[in-house]
């Protein structure tokens, strides 16, 4: 016997969260809970404004239609990426095919005063990998901050993300302020320039390795080994079903590329599932999941060690 519930939710965000030049005041999304016999499976559907092609309202419409079809015996996955991902997670939990083991290590997202960051990063246990958003300020400032962190902490490796913010000139301005002796400790820089060709040129000219992120979701993208390209950053909420995520990871690994499972600012429920996916598909790579502190609460499932208050399922708005 099948049954299902769909919940709608909103979580207040910290004041400083800006995506694609717009301030994100609340994170909105949906949960689906599927039950069959004694088993149940959960999934999160939370399109990311400015990055997902679908809106929250469009995802809700597609999800409700899919759930009704599933209750009637139809299991075909929807095409909309955020819905396909959430539904496939729920089905995987239901079938016990999503392993429970999780990778809760995080590459901390570095914000704020560089002196405070140096103290925090120097105290990190184990492998020191951190992430810095660049492209939000002047490229020269970004270069100086990155150089300062790498100089102060000799065993630190940085993942940088420019979100295609730079022209070739700005990319060169950034690189000018990063000591060539430190550049090998930039694990990768995600999508430095507005076009892939400019990003490739940046890698050739600076010796700084790059990673593809937005490019993975463009229709003309193909997985190929290229000089200067070290990694792909896979955001499952923007990608689609678990099968599609696994196919992309396998394609990257076959070329010797690092595949990083990364957050689209999901709630704690979605983040714990991403941690399980990372442990399953990319066990040797620290995932990019350090986004929970951008929110003011957890929901349904806790992220280990987080002090944020937990909102229980009974407090959510039920749609079905």
From Swiss-Prot:
Pathway: Quinol/quinone metabolism; 1,4-dihydroxy-2-naphthoate biosynthesis; 1,4-dihydroxy-2-naphthoate from chorismate: step 4/7; Quinol/quinone metabolism; menaquinone biosynthesis. It catalyses: (1R,6R)-6-hydroxy-2-succinyl-cyclohexa-2,4-diene-1-carboxylate = 2-succinylbenzoate + H2O. It comes from Escherichia coli (strain SMS-3-5 / SECEC). Transmembrane segments: none annotated. Mg(2+) binds at residues 161, 190, 213. One of its GO terms (biological process) is menaquinone biosynthetic process. Converts 2-succinyl-6-hydroxy-2,4-cyclohexadiene-1-carboxylate (SHCHC) to 2-succinylbenzoate (OSB). This is o-succinylbenzoate synthase. Belongs to the mandelate racemase/muconate lactonizing enzyme family. MenC type 1 subfamily.
């Amino acid at each position: 016997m099948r049954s299902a519930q769909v919940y709608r939710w909103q979580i207040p965000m910290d004041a400083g969260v800006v995506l694609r030049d717009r301030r994100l005041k609340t994170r909105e999304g949906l949960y689906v809970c599927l039950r069959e016999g004694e088993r149940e499976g959960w999934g999160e559907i939370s399109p990311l404004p400015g990055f997902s092609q679908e809106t929250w309202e469009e995802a809700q419409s597609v999800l409700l239609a899919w759930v009704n079809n599933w209750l009637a015996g139809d299991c075909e996955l929807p095409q909309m990426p955020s819905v396909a991902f959430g539904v496939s997670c729920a089905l995987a939990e239901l079938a016990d095919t999503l392993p429970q083991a999780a990778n809760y290590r995080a590459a901390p997202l570095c914000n704020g005063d560089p002196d405070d960051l140096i103290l925090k990063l120097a105290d990190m246990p184990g492998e020191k990998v951190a992430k810095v958003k660049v492209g939000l300020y002047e490229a020269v400032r970004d270069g100086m901050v990155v150089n300062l962190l790498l100089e102060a902490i000799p065993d630190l490796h940085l993942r940088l993300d420019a979100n295609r913010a730079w022209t070739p000139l700005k990319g060169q301005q950034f690189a000018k302020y990063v000591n060539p002796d430190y550049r090998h400790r930039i694990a990768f820089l995600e999508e430095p320039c507005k076009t892939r060709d400019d990003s490739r040129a940046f890698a050739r000219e600076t010796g700084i390795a790059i990673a593809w992120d937005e490019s993975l979701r463009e229709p003309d993208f193909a997985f190929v080994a290229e000089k200067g390209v070290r990694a792909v950053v896979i955001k499952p909420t923007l990608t689609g079903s678990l099968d599609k995520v696994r196919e992309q990871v396998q394609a990257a690994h076959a070329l010797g590329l690092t595949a990083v499972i990364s957050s689209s600012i999901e709630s704690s429920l979605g983040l714990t599932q991403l941690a399980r996916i990372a442990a399953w598909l990319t066990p040797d790579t620290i995932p990019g999941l350090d986004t929970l502190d951008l929110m003011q609460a957890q929901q349904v499932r806790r992220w280990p060690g987080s002090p944020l208050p937990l909102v229980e399922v009974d407090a959510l708005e039920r749609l079905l």
